[in-house]
């Protein structure tokens, strides 16, 4: 996928965030939550919360957009907007109403399932997960503001930008596009990379207060599962939490903060 993207996508995405935060009233919608059975995986929400906290520190007004059960889990601790599960007939109207209500300056999708050519949502195993999936695609399709898509597998919102490359893979790729696509081995890591760039631009080490394991425990306590093992563990896509901690430390060093 990386070869299909114009180099500099991390920097361009970070610049879109900076531009959106130019006013004190800046509103950033962050869509996340990939369903696994009747719950959600750790990859996505972890990075979404990190972006939420960073945007808040920079004076923005972030809003997490997700379906049940994730929306209900986060509602007590974060500003959230809940979207309906499997409501195919009303998903465009739902998006229009939300966009009219919130008037976002930027929309970010991180590890959100994207509609495929058949009009369904599928996981990396090719299983149809539409019945448990809320639709965030129309938020990006109808947006009058810039949009960022973050993903790692090819079936996430934003991957329509590289659909010609993905058709050669044995997956059901997403056809939903975005203004700037950011990819990483784990979507959460892309969020940390963007925060590192924002930190460098502002001269503030925002990753220093990023307690990844604490948020992972928080999500686990609400029933999250690893997207690979489908088990309630403190892991991200089958990888131990220490790997993310090491990545965050490396990003801080690269940014010149430690």
Where do the protein language model's features map onto the residues?
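Short, glycine-rich nucleotide/cofactor-binding loops
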Residues: 2-5, 34-46
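Positively charged, low-complexity intrinsically disordered leader regions
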Residues: 1-27
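Short internal beta-strands
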Residues: 59-67
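Structural motif
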Residues: 27, 105-106
